[in-house]
């Protein structure tokens, strides 16, 4: 069982230890974590850049995966609601590029992709990856009744 996280840019070396710590905690739930790091396009036209990067994302989504895109216009979920998304053997989370993604192209090409939000704040990619990993661990802890999540 695998969780893929598609994002842009490589992970800074100093953050790899933090990612690995969270990944190791997730492994106890029999899931592997795969980072799919894409290169941002240097296109100056922002709409064209978003379209090209969205096409790159669509090509990298693993087959037979339940897929979710993080976007500020997505559905805001609680940790308990997020844990319910972890009921599939293969899951893919997408973190768009610095200008986001072409959401219309995503919706047209893959209407099965859910749009999620962790709130109205904007995060650096390196921080958001860590937040996603922590929420995956928290979600599994909720799902399997482990003592980690204390809120209702």
Curated annotation (Swiss-Prot):
Lineage: superkingdom: Bacteria
Subcellular location: Cytoplasm
Gene3D superfamilies: 3.40.1280.10
Binding-site positions, S-adenosyl-L-methionine: 69, 96, 118-123
Family note: Belongs to the RNA methyltransferase RlmH family.
Function noted in UniProt: Specifically methylates the pseudouridine at position 1915 (m3Psi1915) in 23S rRNA.
Name by which UniProt lists this protein: Ribosomal RNA large subunit methyltransferase H
Encoding gene, per UniProt annotation: rlmH
